[in-house]
Regions:
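Mid-protein regulatory/catalytic core that forms ligand/cofactor-binding pockets
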Residues: 107-177
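Basic helix-turn-helix/winged-helix DNA-binding cores
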Residues: 1-87
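Amphipathic alpha-helical dimerization/coiled-coil segments
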Residues: 75-122
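A structure-centric signal for secondary-structure junctions around beta-strands
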Residues: 60-61, 93, 147
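Active-site phosphate/pyrophosphate-handling residues
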Residues: 9, 91, 158
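Generic structural signal for hydrophobic core residues of well-folded globular domains
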Residues: 14, 96-100, 163, 167
Length: 177
């Protein structure tokens, strides 16, 4: 996952009231191997601060609290990536959309971002198909792997397009503008 998107996702998650790395793992599916280094980076950047607490099992655990700068970034940091180029990682795209929705982004902006990500995936899938068999011969390991990648990109593109359509349909008329 893109580091900046992971950082935004973690900040947004803490802005929703969660406090620990364990919460990130349990409720958001972020592994401790990803979240702990990200939390250290966020703490070094003064976006979160750690509060050691003794839990019910008398073990020390770290609760995290957003600083003013962290709260500001959590609520507005998604704008640049959303309006800029789509992150390549499918998980990053979904997490960025989650952050934007939490921050009450305009439906049109989120849907346009999803459409662009879907288009990029379709384009990648098309370019992945051109000439693959001529270069590698009959269907072998490389051709099978490439065919799988093309299928995955097509499925992701379809999902992102359907998600954009769903957002547009659910949004009240005033929020679409």
């Amino acid at each position: 996952m893109n580091r900046s998107v992971l950082n935004l996702f973690i900040l947004s998650f803490f802005d929703r009231g969660f406090e620990t790395a364990y919460d990130l793992q349990r409720h958001a599916g972020v592994s401790l191997g990803s979240s702990l280094p990200a939390l250290r980076r966020l703490e070094a950047a003064s976006l979160v601060k750690s509060k050691p607490q003794v839990g019910s099992s008398k073990r020390l655990r770290h609760e995290f609290e957003l600083t003013a700068a962290g709260r500001k970034l959590a609520r507005g940091g998604w704008i640049a990536p959303l309006k800029g180029q789509s992150p390549g990682n499918f998980d990053s795209i979904l997490r960025l959309v989650d952050v934007a929705q939490h921050c009450q982004a305009k439906v049109a902006d989120v849907a346009a971002f999803l459409d662009a990500a879907s288009s990029a995936r379709r384009s990648s899938a098309r370019s992945g198909r051109t000439g693959s068999r001529e270069k590698r011969g009959p269907l072998g390991i490389m051709a099978t792997r490439e065919a799988w990648s093309v299928s995955r990109l097509q499925a992701e593109a379809g999902f992102l397009a359907a998600l954009a359509k769903s957002l547009r349909q659910k949004a009240p008329r005033s929020a679409k503008r």
